[in-house]
Amino acid sequence: MADTDIIIHDEKDNVGVVVIEKITPNQDCNCWIMENDKSLSIQSKNEIPLGHKIAMVDLNEGDTILKYGHDIGKVVKSIKKGEHVHVHNVKTKKW
């Protein structure tokens, strides 16, 4: 596969992390799953900056976000596969 655009830390993760300057809408992105050294691709729906997350699957309100194989928050507004995952649609479960 070509250069990596998105890293997925654990095979159970439902988000990946952008590792290039930015992803543009409708960009075909190359993903690398670190845990098992597998590759896959996804098409972005939005512009997503470096270090931000992208949904690897459709996520519904109330779903748990998994990163590093761990619960990092809950979906507060439905997110489609390929969309930007950030504070506008995910909140912590801590408060």
Q: PLM features: what roles do these ranges have?
A:
Residues 2-95:
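N-terminal small-residue-enriched
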